[in-house]
């Protein structure tokens, strides 16, 4: 059995969880999130905790119980603390500027790159070379960060490009004559 699913999800004060037939919704101080969980797993409330149990006779139910538990835990964390991903621009003339729900990037192309943020995701630029993406949905925050990074991934010789702030880019050695 999945060891992840054995641990219950703690429900902090101010968080409201609604369990439907095949979906769960979590509402907290930062907002609300919904997630489809299917019929392989049952969620039961046990005081101030939520327990994930695999359904008997359903294929992959034991495997999905750990996944659903992790998703619900991320939802609870998202509506209480939120998630953020930091990106850094490395390169001469590479700049970022947040304008409302848009992110303007100057990445050495002949044109500026404008990335539209989806609903529920906010972007900040503390400096011209730092980008902070925040939101309550962990998957969505990570997806937006990956899309922004994909505009100019770090190249292997000088390391120029958009990288995660905690990313280590291994540089290659140049060709010797």
Curated annotation (Swiss-Prot):
InterPro entries: Ribosomal_uL6-like, Ribosomal_uL6-like_a/b-dom_sf, Ribosomal_uL6_a/b-dom, Ribosomal_uL6_bac-type, Ribosomal_uL6_CS. Pfam families: Ribosomal_L6. One of its GO terms (biological process) is cytoplasmic translation. GO terms for cellular component: cytosolic large ribosomal subunit. It comes from the Bacteria. The keyword Methyltransferase does not apply. GO terms for molecular function: rRNA binding; structural constituent of ribosome. Keywords: Ribonucleoprotein, Ribosomal protein, RNA-binding, rRNA-binding. Part of the 50S ribosomal subunit. Belongs to the universal ribosomal protein uL6 family. This protein binds to the 23S rRNA, and is important in its secondary structure. It is located near the subunit interface in the base of the L7/L12 stalk, and near the tRNA binding site of the peptidyltransferase center. This is Large ribosomal subunit protein uL6. It comes from Aromatoleum aromaticum (strain DSM 19018 / LMG 30748 / EbN1) (Azoarcus sp. (strain EbN1)).
């Amino acid at each position: 059995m999945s060891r992840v699913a054995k641990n219950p999800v703690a429900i902090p004060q101010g968080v409201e969880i609604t369990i439907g037939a095949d979906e769960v919704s979590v509402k907290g101080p930062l907002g609300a999130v919904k997630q489809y969980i299917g019929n392989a797993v049952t969620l039961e409330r046990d005081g101030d905790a939520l327990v994930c149990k695999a359904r008997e006779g359903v294929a992959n139910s034991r495997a999905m119980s750990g996944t659903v538990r992790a998703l619900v835990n991320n939802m609870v964390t998202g509506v209480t603390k939120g998630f953020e991903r930091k990106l850094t621009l490395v390169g001469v003339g590479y700049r970022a500027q947040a304008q409302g729900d848009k992110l303007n990037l100057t990445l050495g192309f002949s044109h500026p790159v404008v990335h539209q943020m989806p609903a529920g995701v906010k972007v900040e630029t503390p400096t011209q070379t730092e980008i902070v993406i925040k939101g309550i949905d962990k998957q969505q925050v990570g997806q937006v960060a990956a899309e922004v990074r994909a505009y100019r991934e770090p190249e292997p010789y000088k390391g120029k490009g958009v990288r995660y702030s905690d990313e280590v880019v291994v540089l290659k050695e140049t060709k010797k004559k």
